[in-house]
Each structure stands twice: as structure tokens, then as C-alpha cells.
């Protein structure tokens, strides 16, 4: 097993995950472009240009990027103070955060349904008020949102102490800050992997348009409040620290993110799977077994804080660490395999799950119904069903921000707010064009990911990213599907894409 971050693995099994992810990307790109007209009835994207045209544009822009890398070869690194560069980067991200806050101030509004429950629950906790019966029932059914509610209650309380007219705005700024930090961490991963500066600079510009100034920064919900943790776990796993330290800290990151958004655990699962494969292909000795046991112990210790946060938050809001009314993962598997709404939210599914008195009965019934859904379809029907779900997950480069419903709009009348609403709001005159640009950038990212898994499939960093994103896709195919669920791993998509672009540039230089 290699100890270098970009070195090649000796086993044959780890690169197989890259081949699987490459096949999945080709399938998705085919669905999004060639299958758009057949699939758009299941998910309306609202772009002003068809996806196949945007794919050609994305391929052309990527080709131009690679060509510029070839005609302008990397310069020798200039000596510079690492401390000075760190301060310069910090100042840059701080300035961008100020712009993000200005953008959020112009665009924020009150979201409906689950985000509304979290917002009102956090406000009640911060003010020391009891939860209404409506929200108490909600958190007993959906305890997965309890940790975020507790976290946001602390943010709301801080906003109250600062004397803000609407303390909720500080929660919005928190979403912008965590998105900012996730992009900064992705850039740190690329520096750690010694990706050439010219690639990082263009990649940073792409990240700024695609993520830093995405309308998602006004959404203080699970997607934004957990997006830092997977990419931070990735950075930790790529350090030169001892294995127990790396895996223990990565487990801590993923468990804290997983308390807010369970899919954050996927990166940790991928890392453990790759580590197990390398262990099996490595010559066994006493030192290796000892190191493996230390890693296992470190992971167990690392996940405890996240589990404590989750259980403690649920206990605080519902009075029980495991409410009998909780819908559970089996419920989301059931609605994820239901073809009535093609894996989307189902009110009938919630009613069905709520008809059982205990969690064990509900889980058993949900699993039986999920299996029945799959068995009642033919092989061709199942292929069509999962193709629709894959299309729904990957068909929107904005991660379907406009799918969020508005509970109460906040309409600022200044010129900047009016201008930004024309771009980012669904009813805005320029929103279709904005969505087309975001879709083109998203297709560029997917093409870069495809290049990375095909050309760098033996590198550990690529294998870890590919297996994580493959697991994320499997999660979308099996459970409830929403494009916004991909936002959590958007920084990981970015890292993998830039690794692919750099490799394309290197191959062009050799030619």
C-alpha cells in the first residue's frame, strides 16, 4: 500500500470503483442530454437551452481550459512566505463572505415545510418557550432534524444578543459562512494534492459562481449546515498524519455532519472500505494488525460525539432518544422505491407509516412494502424507474433551489435586491438564463469527474472521491431523491473534477 497521496494502489479492486463511477457518469450524462425529452415530464428544469447544447458548450469550455494549460505550461513556483499566503487567502475568503452576506441580505425569505419547522423550533428553544403540539408531533416523526434545530437555536440566541431586528438572519449568514468554508477546504485539498496553480485559479472562479454565490447560501437547512464536513474529512484523510489520527478525526467530522445530514457518513464508509481492501491486499504482520485495531478504535471514538449530539438533541426536543413515532430510514427507503411519485415525497407514504403504533412494526411493514414495490415491476420497468430517479438527481445544476416553497416572502425594495431577484428567483426575468449557466458549469464538473476516474483511477484521492460519490448516487437511487441532496458533496465533486482537468492538461503536454 502506497503512502503517497497521489501514488498508485497495488490492488486491482480499488480502481474497480472508479470504473463503476465512470459507467454511472456516462449513464447520467446520457439521461440528462439524450434522454432529456423523454425524462423532462418527470422533472421540469426550466432551462432556456436544451441539455445536449449545454453539454457541447461544457465540453468546448473544458477543451479550451485544457488547451490553455498546454500552451501556457506551469511556471516554476516562486518562493513566498506560507504565512503571508495564508493571510492573503483568509482575507480573500473574508471579502467573499462579506459579498455573500450582502447577497443573502437581499434575497432571504422564510421557507415552508421542514425548514419552517426547524426555524420555529429553534426560535422556541432560544426563547425558552415550549414547542407547540404541531411541531412536537413533527419532531417525533422526523427526529433527524433535531440536531440542526438545537444548533440553530444557539445561532438565534446569539442574534438576539446582538440586537438584530430579525435574529433568523444570522442563521442565513451561517449558511453562507459554511458554504464559504467548504470551498476554502476544497481548495486546501487541491493544494495538498499539489494541483497546479493555474488549474486551481480557474477552479476557484468556477466554485465562486457555482457555490459561493449560489442561492443556497440563504437556506439555513441541513444541506448548507453539513456541507463543510465531508470535504473536511477528505482533507484530513489526505494528510500525512498517522492512520489512527486521520481516521479518528475524519470519523469525528463525518459524525458531526451526519448528525445534521446522515449522508455525510458516506465519505467515512468509503474510506473504511478502501482501507479494508488495502489491508486485505497487504502482507499481514503483527504491526499491521495492531495499526488496524488502533484505526478501528479511533473511528469508534470519533463517531461518539456526533451520536451524542444526535441523541441529545432528540431527547431535548421529544423527551426520548428514540421516539416510537419516528419514521426511520425504512420509511424513506419505501417512498424512495415507490413509483407513484418516482422516489419523491409521498403524503400517502407518511400516512401509511404513521398508521403503525411502534417503530418495529413500522420498520417491518416499510421494508416489506419496499421489497414489494421492486418485485411488482419487471426488469425493464425497474431500469426505467431508476433512470428517472438518476435523472431527477443529476438534471439540475442549481440543485433545484427553486423547489423550496415560500412560507413568507421578504421583499426588499432597494435596487440591488430587485436586480438579484431577477436572477435568482424563479419568477425573475433572467432566471432561465442563470439556470442554463449553472447547468453548463455542472456538466463541466461532471465531465471533469469522468476524466479523473478514467485517467487517475489508481490514485487514492480519486478512488476515495469516486467511491463516496458512487455511494451518494446509490443513496439517491434507493431512498428519497432530491437534486439538493447532491449539494452536500458539491465540494467533493469540485475536487474530483479539477483533478481530471489537470490530468487532461498533462496528457496534452506529453503529446
Mark where each language-model region is.
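Membrane-interface anchor segments at the N-terminal boundary of transmembrane helices
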Residues: 41-55, 170-174, 389-469
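Membrane-proximal stem/loop segments at transmembrane-domain junctions that anchor or position
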Residues: 131-132, 311-415
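Short hydrophobic/aromatic helix or loop-helix immediately within or flanking a transmembrane segment
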Residues: 137-164, 173-176
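Multi-pass, polyprenyl lipid-linked donor-dependent membrane glycosyltransferases
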Residues: 170-178, 205-237, 260-267, 485-490
Amino acid at each position: 500500500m502506497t503512502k503517497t497521496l497521489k501514488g498508485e494502489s497495488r490492488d486491482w479492486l480499488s480502481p474497480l470503483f472508479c470504473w463503476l463511477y465512470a459507467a454511472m457518469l456516462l449513464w447520467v450524462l446520457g439521461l440528462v442530454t439524450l434522454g432529456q425529452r423523454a425524462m423532462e415530464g418527470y422533472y421540469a428544469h426550466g432551462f432556456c437551452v436544451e441539455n445536449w447544447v449545454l453539454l457541447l458548450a461544457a465540453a468546448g469550455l473544458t477543451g479550451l481550459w485544457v488547451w490553455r494549460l498546454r500552451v501556457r505550461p506551469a511556471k516554476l513556483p516562486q518562493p513566498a512566505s506560507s504565512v503571508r499566503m495564508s493571510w492573503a487567502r483568509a482575507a480573500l475568503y473574508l471579502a467573499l463572505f462579506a459579498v455573500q452576506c450582502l447577497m443573502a441580505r437581499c434575497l432571504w425569505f422564510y421557507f415552508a415545510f421542514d425548514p419552517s419547522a426547524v426555524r420555529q423550533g429553534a426560535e422556541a428553544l432560544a426563547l425558552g418557550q415550549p414547542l407547540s403540539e404541531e411541531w412536537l408531533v413533527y419532531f417525533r416523526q422526523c427526529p433527524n432534524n433535531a440536531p440542526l434545530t438545537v444548533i440553530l437555536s444557539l445561532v438565534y440566541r446569539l442574534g438576539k444578543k446582538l440586537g438584530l431586528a430579525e435574529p433568523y438572519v444570522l442563521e442565513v449568514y451561517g449558511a453562507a459562512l459554511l458554504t464559504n468554508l467548504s470551498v476554502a477546504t476544497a481548495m486546501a485539498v487541491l493544494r495538498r494534492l499539489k494541483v497546479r496553480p493555474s488549474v486551481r485559479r480557474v477552479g476557484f472562479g468556477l466554485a465562486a459562481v457555482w457555490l459561493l454565490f449560489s442561492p443556497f447560501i440563504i437556506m439555513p437547512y441541513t444541506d448548507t449546515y453539513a456541507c463543510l464536513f465531508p470535504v473536511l474529512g477528505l482533507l484530513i484523510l489526505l494528510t500525512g498524519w498517522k492512520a489512527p489520527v486521520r481516521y479518528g478525526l475524519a470519523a469525528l467530522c463525518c459524525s458531526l455532519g451526519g448528525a445534521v445530514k446522515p449522508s455525510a457518513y458516506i465519505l467515512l464508509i468509503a474510506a473504511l472500505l478502501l482501507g479494508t481492501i488495502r489491508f486485505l491486499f497487504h502482507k499481514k504482520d503483527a504491526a499491521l494488525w495492531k495499526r488496524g485495531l488502533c484505526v478501528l478504535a479511533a473511528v469508534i471514538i470519533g463517531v461518539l460525539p456526533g451520536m451524542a449530539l444526535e441523541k441529545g438533541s432528540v431527547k431535548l426536543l421529544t423527551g426520548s432518544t428514540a421516539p416510537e413515532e419516528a419514521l426511520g430510514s425504512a420509511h424513506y427507503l419505501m417512498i424512495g422505491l415507490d413509483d407513484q411519485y418516482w422516489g419523491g415525497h409521498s403524503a400517502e407514504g407518511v400516512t401509511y407509516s404513521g398508521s403503525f403504533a411502534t417503530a418495529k412494526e413500522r420498520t417491518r411493514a416499510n421494508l416489506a412494502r419496499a421489497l414489494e414495490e421492486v418485485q411488482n415491476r419487471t426488469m425493464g420497468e425497474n431500469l426505467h424507474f431508476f433512470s428517472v430517479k438518476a435523472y431527477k438527481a443529476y438534471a439540475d445544476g442549481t440543485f433545484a433551489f427553486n423547489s423550496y416553497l415560500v412560507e413568507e416572502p421578504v421583499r426588499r425594495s432597494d435596487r440591488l435586491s430587485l436586480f438579484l431577484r431577477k436572477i435568482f428567483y424563479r419568477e425573475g426575468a433572467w432566471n432561465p438564463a442563470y439556470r442554463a449557466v449553472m447547468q453548463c458549469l455542472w456538466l463541466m464538473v461532471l465531465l471533469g469527474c469522468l476524466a479523473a476516474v478514467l485517467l487517475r483511477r489508481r490514485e487514492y484521492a480519486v478512488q476515495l472521491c469516486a467511491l463516496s460519490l458512487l455511494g451518494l448516487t446509490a443513496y439517491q437511487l434507493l431512498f428519497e431523491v432530491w437534486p439538493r441532496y447532491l449539494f452536500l458533496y458539491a465540494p467533493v465533486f469540485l475536487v474530483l473534477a479539477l483533478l481530471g482537468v489537470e490530468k487532461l492538461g498533462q496528457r496534452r503536454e506529453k503529446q
